Amino acid sequence: MEQLAQSGIGLALAAFALTVVATRRVLGYLRQKQIMDLPNERSSHSLPTPRGGGLATTPVLALALLVQADFRFLGIGALALLAISWIDDRKGLPPGPRFAAHGVAVLGLLLLLPGDALVFQGVLPLWADRVLALLGWLWFVNLYNFMDGIDGITGVETLSLGLGIALVGGGTLTAPALVVAAVAAAFLVFNWHPAKLFLGDSGSVPFGYVLGGLLVMLA
């Protein structure tokens, strides 16, 4: 257990440093290309602010998951969602293709769960357990997408949940949960009020997906 915690802390520190470096580069690119989040009634910013920080956070998060055998498919799913979400950030996508991509990524992970790994602890039959887990996970992903655009909120929520999962879950969940928290903390350097950068769909959707997956595994 102690060795798992130590390796998780080391991986998290590396992820924090890499995210800070990558985010600085991405921020310059977004400013150059004028990829901006325009203020609306939900916004806490009054000026156009670069959007697309997920180009930095998601690859670091996915890489840290890919080097852990138990979480490789979660990392692959995060990269797939980065690709579709970046298109949405740049050009906009209708809800159908976006939700379909989210559904495929979530369903793929649920199908990999062993039949005796019941998310709702056996209260429901297997088919109902998986359907409810699918709907809950999709809701969670889209909740994260909705939160983006408000200074600091997504980063603080992600940091808190990551640390909470690491403390409560322990074991093999420690390292990925600490990495999630570390990447979120690094992003907060740029997203704290007044925000210099927002995640965009390319960051908020994969964050919600990965955290949702860890919560399912915790259950």
Label for each model-derived stretch:
Residues 1-219:
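"…together with the soluble PPM/PP2C metallo-phosphatase catalytic core" -> "…together
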